Amino acid sequence: MHGKELAGRLRKRENDNDLSPNSSSSPAERFRCPHPECNKTFSRQEHLSRHKLNHWPKEIYVCSYVLPTTNAPCNKTFVRKDLLIRHEKRHSKVKNRLSRPSKDQISSSNKDFSKNAPYNPSEVPLSTQSGTSTINLIKNSVNPPPSITQESKFRPFLQQAQQPQQVQQSQQPQQIQQLQQLQFPQQLRAPLQQPMLQQQMHPQQASPTFPSYDPRIRNNGQNGNQFFNLIFDNRTGVNGFEVDAANNNGNGNDQNMNINPAVQQQRYQDRNFASSSYQQPLQPLTQDQQQEQYFQQQKLAQQQQQQQQQQQQQQQLPPQNPFGDPLTSSSSGANLSVMQDLFSTNFLNSDPLQSFMQELSEAPQVSIEDTFSDKNTIPPNEKPVQQDEGFQNPPVMFELPQDNIKIPKAQPKFNDNPSTSVKDNLSSQKLNINELKRRSSKDSGVGNNSSLNYKEQLRHSMKSVPSFFHPDPLTKYKISKEKCQEMFSFVPELRYVSIESIHKSLKSFWLNFHPQYGLLHKPSFHVDKQPAILNLALIMTGASFLGSEYREQISDPICGPLRWIIFSHADFQPPSKTYIIQSLLLVEGYEKTSTNRYLHERSFLHHGTTIQLLRRTPSLGGHPLMVKTGKTSGENSIQDPQEVYKRWIDFEMLKRIAFYAFYMDTTHAVVFGYWNLFINSNQIQLTLPCPDQVWESYDLSYETLMEHGYGSTKRDENNTFLSALMQLMKNVIQILRNNNIRRNKVNNGGIESTPTDLESTTDWNIQSLFGKKILLAGIISILFQCQEEVNGDYFITNFRGGITDHLGLSWKDILSFAMNYWLHEVQKSCTDPKACRISTPSEETLTNRKIDEDNGDGLCDDDLDLLSSDNPSNCKIPVIHISQIVLRILHHDYYIYAGAPWRMNVPIGRDEYDMISRRILQFAKDPYNGGVAVVYAFQFLFEMFIIKENNVPTVVKSYNINSDPVITRPYAIALTSLLIWSCNFALHGCEVSIWDNTEASKDECFQPDDSNGGNILGNTDNNGSTIANNNLKEKNNYIPIESFEVYLLRMYRNLYVDSSLDVVSFQNDVWAKASLLQHISNTHFLCGMMQFMRDIFNKSYWDLGREFGKLFDNCLERSLGKTSPTCHNMFDV
């Protein structure tokens, strides 16, 4: 009965995919497979792209698993790596679609099941359809001995299969045969106690239905990697780490950990099996053998139609895949989330420039018939493969509907303003299909261009600067009057701004903002050819670096209406144009760091909107207007380099926007204290940004691109963000174990371990500054994911053993070390200008050529280039220091303790303040929490205000808060200063007691009846006024015991950690300084520091900066003896 239902569904699906006259789907809305013998059509282009791999696979992936029953390799082949990974999981008996059955289901299906054997999580339920189906429960009759288990490779924590501790000799093959005949309903679910979790269980301690986990069992560092597998939990199809515990003999210190990053990048190999008969080496298949096996399986699939239909029913994507594994199913949540995650490379076009260079650098194409004619690999009944259908070079074009098809016009879905006509993008998409068809037909008529001579001509043509590049520096900022009029129509206030100020603002953007991130492609940028909205965003951002006057006259008038201008624009409607998202990100950055509190909060509220627009962009969402022709190889894919450059720029720019949104999401959450991330690190499956020397260069010659890795087949395999992040975490674990780092060693007088094996870790050669910063954002994302889990029993129960207890380190210590590792090994420095800004030597040459024209415009680079003139010792990536603090304490606690009347619009009462005070005191007493956080805070202040002149440290006080080119640095200075004051005040109290607290009382400090949190004291009588005036006079006349310069230099001599140390010595030194901090006297002499910070932030144009100024003044008063903790007028700015 069920077989008939399945056959009926398959026939229905085939009819849906059939392009026939009777088909209900309009051909104009579907994509047809270009194979001459295939009539499949698909509703989405990416479905067609996956389906075409069945005809023209780019690579054949072979399963290397050795079957225990036959001692023979599986050798099943797949055309997609994710299918192979999913298939291999079935071998390892992890991530089953179905879980253990309930007691009722067991008894209803077979009453004797409970008598035969208890439930074993290692059993693999198989199912192909809904309803009742046969489930084969395969159980090993003999369990591996403990010695073999220790030497075998650990599986990821979230994918652990059961490994019993005791060998149960009562299990006989006859029982296995009985279990294989059992039938259960398909709708089986895992118990609620274990969401997403399959781990090593111990049946003698567990119930048949709900296995338990004993946290006392320690498997030599296994739980340390279980922690990381919680982070990379395969919800997006990326596995965590695998740990090799080989020949450790119970000594965790000598155990080497081999953590494989991203199983998507590698296949399971070198497995150890319980029986010695399984130890035979597995010979890898050669390329010819893989191809031969591929064609043989094609023939086999055609002869076994029913098996093919079962595979199609389980593997929805791609349709009718003859190489799929019948055990896999795309209905599982993990694999489905991969397809739905629009930040993954499954939906992003492959790098056009990389594909073009690979084809251009390879040898002349040879027909597949000539190559394999002597091997007889093509079955007799198989049609010979044509030259353009070669194994490595599939056809790249797809057919589109005819010109005479009438496309209905959709009605507009949205009008923001009656006077504004917002176009319907869906209608535009359909109207452009004919244009795509004409473009496709032109490309299909191109002859054989892959000859050696033609390739040589292409290589030679690449030596010239592309025609759409604009080497003239004036094209980047000297905007025309016509373009200004277009901007004035959006923001009329700009009419009163001089054209020179607009030019200056644009140039400031390229000098101060662009070198930090490289969002735009500068060589192809021409200011007069950009949309007015993008130009407004660039002017607003550039003017924000030039002082309060430019912010008031230019940035603020643009920022106020610009967000609503973007929201009401036609190009905002999804799928949004790239410049729309670029502009939104720039607006958000300015709103958060340079405006008032209203716009600051508005920016965070609308951050989710930008993320959603990004998820719906053409390249990330499979938009039909983006030509996904699959031109990765083949003759017809070689085309004009100019077109390749344009597609590559669009591809790379959109990827950088996605990364910048992720970077803002994580780093701004750390700096500003927002804890709800919109994007997690395991959702980012994009390749890292291309090298800066390529992105910023006007020279895209063949030789230059080859020098930077383009054309190499290995480039795209190892430069994904997630694989790089996981490799970084692997190195961190390896260094921690090899050096046996323990934080309690610092109590014995400093560094005891000698750093070893640092050279054996990865040599990080990331050639993109922004790519390096993205890895830091990934670590921060892990931090937030850990903090979300830390309060649950799920986290506490399972992460006590292994490396965390064995080395005396918590997960916070591991992440803290990971940040230090990133700073020392990946970024190299957070102060060196060469390491913190993009250098463009090719542009410098072009600028020198145009120096006369530049001078004629009257704009001097020295006055505008604040980033280059920034002190070389200043920290340019403050988020690295703030992250170390957030890892140990939230901003909320010391922000309230310093006197803020409310946080996140929630007023603070007396009870809440008392509770926070106790937490701050406990935190400050702990040297490995409060002490370490304070040491990192001091390191940041040392970098910001101390320089060495002839090796003599000197304090620099000339800091202009309104012209800081690093937008998060003012907030970071305020946070670190407040943390230092809070910890020292909690431990030691005030500096002096000269404040008159006669009229102050604890009850007056907090007024519960005031729902608005105003809490303003009402001392208006003459006595109160006299006391207040006297206190004010005492505060103004007070000379601190130690000025800011004296105090900071004294702390520098005691707490400075040399950043030139290797990462292990640096980490140990930080712990040593944290222990030493408790023995430094008079650390609470902070009145001079509070006066200095108050004066800096009182001059801030930014409203939040002036709020900090009032808060610092409140801290000064409390250091003078004031007992009232709250700064009642903090937000009156």
UniProtKB/Swiss-Prot annotation:
Gene Ontology terms, MF aspect: DNA-binding transcription factor activity, RNA polymerase II-specific; RNA polymerase II cis-regulatory region sequence-specific DNA binding; sequence-specific DNA binding; zinc ion binding
Positions of the UniProt region annotated as Disordered: 1-34, 90-130, 195-225, 283-334, 371-451
Keywords: Cytoplasm, Metal-binding, Nucleus, Repeat, Zinc, Zinc-finger
Compositionally biased region (Basic residues): 90-100
Residue stretches of biased makeup (Polar residues): 414-432
Main location per the UniProt record: cytoplasm
Subcellular location: Cytoplasm; Nucleus
Biological process per Gene Ontology, one example term: regulation of transcription by RNA polymerase II
PROSITE patterns: ZINC_FINGER_C2H2_1, ZINC_FINGER_C2H2_2
Additional note from the record: Present with 238 molecules/cell in log phase SD medium.
Protein name: Zinc finger protein YPR022C
Species for this entry: Saccharomyces cerevisiae (strain ATCC 204508 / S288c)
Lineage: Eukaryota, Fungi, Dikarya, Ascomycota, Saccharomycotina
